[in-house]
Regions:
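Mixed-charge (Asp/Glu-Lys/Arg
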Residues: 2-109
């Protein structure tokens, strides 16, 4: 829980980390259906020891909609050998275009 200096606005922040070159994070199925206007994810991409991490600040609703849509698309796309994908609780969030990179302004604090 974070608030502005005057304590007139409070938000919740969930932090998820990964390590590697892909800005991709694993979430659970329950993140699809949880909406709150004052909840944000900060996805952290840890790089090599010599590099600073990247921070992606994303509103909860954006994450929920993205993982719901991308999972549905994955289920409807045949696998490498043409087989159907089996549903599972794993969801992935990606920011391919980097539109949420360092978007601390979205927090509105």
């Amino acid at each position: 829980l974070v608030s502005n200096l005057s304590a007139t606005r409070q938000i919740g922040i969930q932090v998820k980390t990964n390590q590697g070159s892909k800005p991709e994070w694993v979430l659970s199925e329950k993140a699809e259906n949880f909406y709150a206007d004052n909840l944000f994810y900060v996805f952290v991409n840890l790089k090599s020891r010599d590099e600073l991490p990247d921070f992606y600040v994303v509103p909860n609703r954006v994450v929920a909609d993205y993982i719901k849509d991308s999972h549905r698309q994955w289920l409807n796309t045949p696998g490498k050998k043409g087989q159907s994908h089996k549903d599972n609780p794993v969801r992935k969030f990606r920011d391919k275009k980097g539109q949420y990179l360092n978007r601390w302004d979205l927090l509105g604090l």
